[in-house]
Amino acid sequence: MDPKFLVVEIDSKERALQLVQVMLENGFARFMLLDDLSRHPTLDRIQREEPRISRDELRETASSPVTFETRHSPYPVHEQKVLFPSFSQVSNSMVTSTGIRQEASSVGVGPIEDDDIVEEEEEEDIRLTSKPCVKRRYDHHAEEQEYRDQLMSLLSGEPEIVPIGVNSNDEPSGSNSDSAAKKAKSVGDYHECQLCGVRVKTPRSGRWNLQMHVIALHCVGRQYKCKQCDYLDYRKSTMRKHTVSQHGSDIPPHNITDNIMKAEWHAAMIKCFPEFAHRTGFLN
C-alpha cells in the first residue's frame, strides 16, 4: 500500500503534545513532527523517483478520503476507523513550499477540543465549588411574628413619660450658665417645677408643655378612656395606637374629663408652677 499522509497544522507545542498523546493512546505509532514537509523521507524519495508526476496528479490522488486501521496496542483499545477530510477540502494557502504557516488549522481535531472544553468546565466547577459559600436561612414567619409582638407590646404598653425639659441639677456654672440662659431666652422660656425640680420649656405664647407635665407626673386623673376597654391615657396619640393595636381600628377615645379632674390639675399647677396659677386654663 502506498504511503498516505495526513497533514494537521499545530499552532503550539501544547497542542502537538496533546495530539501525540491521543495518537499513542489509539495505537498509532508512525508519525513525525516536522517544521518543513519537504524533510519527510518518504516524500523526498517519491519526489526523486517520480519527478514526472505533476502536482495536479498528486492532488487528485490525495483527494479521496482515507482510513487508518489501529495497530495492536498493549492497552485494551477498540478497533476503529477514523475518517479524515481530504486535502482538497483544505485551502491551498495553508501549505507553502517553505513549510506550514503558523495559523489556526481549518482541519480541527475534535477529540482534543472536546477534551479541552471538558477540562475547562471541570476546572471552573472545581473553582466555583471550592469557594466558601454560606447560605443564611431566614425564618420569615418567625421574624414577622417577633416584629408583630414587639409592635403590639410597644403600642399597648403604658407610655413612657419623659419630662419635657432638663433637671436643674445639671445646670452649667459660671459663664456657661449665662450663655445658656441667653440661648434659652432666645428660643423659649424654661420654668422649674417646684415639686420635682425639672425645668420645662414652654413657648412664649402658650403653656401646653406645663399642663402636660402636671397631668403626666403629678396627677392621677386621665381625661381619655377607650370605648372598648378600660384603658386610660392623657394623650390622643397614645389612645389611637392602643385602639389600632388592640381593637383593630382607629376608634376615637371618650373624653371623661370632669370638674374633679380639673380641680386636681389646677391644684397641681399651683404647686408646680405658682406663677401660672392664675391662668392655668384648667378651670376655664
UniProtKB/Swiss-Prot annotation:
<dbReference type="GO" id="GO:0003677">
    <property type="term" value="F:DNA binding"/>
</dbReference>
<keyword id="KW-0479">Metal-binding</keyword>
<keyword id="KW-0805">Transcription regulation</keyword>
<comment type="function">
    <text>Positively regulates the RNA polymerase III-associated transcription of small non-coding RNAs.</text>
</comment>
<keyword id="KW-0238">DNA-binding</keyword>
<keyword id="KW-0862">Zinc</keyword>
<feature type="zinc finger region" description="C2H2-type">
    <location>
        <begin position="224"/>
        <end position="247"/>
    </location>
</feature>
<dbReference type="GO" id="GO:0005634">
    <property type="term" value="C:nucleus"/>
</dbReference>
<keyword id="KW-0539">Nucleus</keyword>
<keyword id="KW-0804">Transcription</keyword>
<dbReference type="GO" id="GO:0008270">
    <property type="term" value="F:zinc ion binding"/>
</dbReference>
<dbReference type="InterPro" id="IPR013087">
    <property type="entry name" value="Znf_C2H2_type"/>
</dbReference>
<keyword id="KW-0863">Zinc-finger</keyword>
<protein>
    <recommendedName>
        <fullName>Transcription factor lir-3</fullName>
    </recommendedName>
</protein>
<feature type="region of interest" description="Disordered">
    <location>
        <begin position="50"/>
        <end position="71"/>
    </location>
</feature>
<feature type="compositionally biased region" description="Basic and acidic residues">
    <location>
        <begin position="50"/>
        <end position="60"/>
    </location>
</feature>
